[in-house]
Amino acid sequence: MNEQTRISLERAAELKSKIDDYIQARKTINRGLEKEEEINKRKQKILSILNGTEEDWNNYKWQLSNRITDVDTLSKIITLTKKEKEYIKEVGTQFRWAISPYYLSLIDPEDICDPIKLLSIPTHIELEDEQEDLDPMGEEYTNPAGCITRRYPDRLIINVTNECAMYCRHCQRRRNIGQQDSHKSKAIIQESIDYIRENEEIRDVLVTGGDALTLKDDYLEWILSQLKEIPHVDYVRLGTRTLVTMPQRITDEFCNMLKKYHPVYINTHFNHPMEITKESKEACEKLANAGVPLGNQAVLLNGINNDKFVMRCLNQELLKIRVKPYYIFQSKHVKGTKHFNTSVDDGLEIMEYLRGYTSGMAIPTYIVNAPKGGGKTPLLPQYLVSKGTDYVMLRTWEGKVIKMEDEPAVDIKKLIKEQAQD
């Protein structure tokens, strides 16, 4: 064996040892694709209680109209203590809750701290939060017309509805949810589109809510067709969690409609590997096959995914279903959600771990939204240790400090011109 091979093998063994802890931890992380049998059993129980059929289950309109919104029905499906039942009713008077039959089937009924349960079912902690701010992003002050939110020079949001298939307990717009579903009228949306048409610097439009995909196909198509007619709008993004909470929404008809209005992007919101199931995988693949790029915007949530192994597993599983991890958001300080908050140090520790320990494709950007509409602020661990006049000291993903030459760029155009002279 030559020296190069010996060193290479030693290095390979060293690298292999660095992944042992994740391989062991991964075995303990619940993943939806590996829980198909248990999910199906719960599905059958839910169908029996709701008097539904397999055909009903696969129909998103049935899923939406049969969201579970009362404690009595919920307690027939998952185990709830007497106190939990009382708390859910009490919280529901202030902060609405509803959960699609599909998403409910993902909950382990016996696990009081099941991550899917924490994401979707109210807890009394929501009422113990003394924070007063329901709009920490200051969105009410960034609404120049219609149902627009504008915080950046060349892009904006159209909030088309307050409806969702499931109301996340950490929702940043819970102030808009109320107790009744309400899509924005054509007049309000038209006002928003007219504003975009009149402001030629707008090139990127995000259609969201609520959940944009709770709108029917024809209403969504009208919005997309209007935006497509505006020359300076380069592309449209749709914000939706239905891929996670109601994947039946992604029909062949819907995908064929989107094809007419490319480039269309979809940003979705997986927070835990348990949410990646056979059904959500099929929904993502349908969209990807229809030419729709998919990006995931996770939120760092205490007790759900503020763990380096869980986040690594989530991002790697997302790539397998053709969803690019795009952002990890620091949770926002919205009233009733304080128990989900983690420290920025937690986020930086996760980002530090991901770098080098998984491929760049599986590493999203860690984002903190500055309060009062300050916008997205990306955060990274510090890899630049120091800087001299002609060098930098870098910290590698393994923590090694290495010196690298760093000189100013030459004037390449001047150099080429000088060399070309006779």
Curated annotation (Swiss-Prot):
Location of the Radical SAM core domain: 150-371
Molecular-function GO term, any one: metal ion binding
Binding site for [4Fe-4S] cluster: C164, C168, C171
UniProt keywords, alphabetically: 4Fe-4S, Iron, Iron-sulfur, Isomerase, Metal-binding, Pyridoxal phosphate, S-adenosyl-L-methionine
Sequence positions bearing N6-(pyridoxal phosphate)lysine: K376
Keyword S-adenosyl-L-methionine listed: yes
Catalysed reactions listed for this entry: L-glutamate = 3-aminopentanedioate
A Pfam short name: LAM_C
Enzyme class, broadest EC rank: isomerase
Names of required cofactors: pyridoxal 5'-phosphate; [4Fe-4S] cluster
EC number: 5.4.3.9
Function: Catalyzes the interconversion of L-glutamate and L-beta-glutamate. Does not have L-lysine 2,3-aminomutase activity.
PANTHER family xrefs: L-LYSINE 2,3-AMINOMUTASE, LYSINE 2,3-AMINOMUTASE-RELATED
Family: Belongs to the radical SAM superfamily.
Record protein name field: Glutamate 2,3-aminomutase
Gene: eam
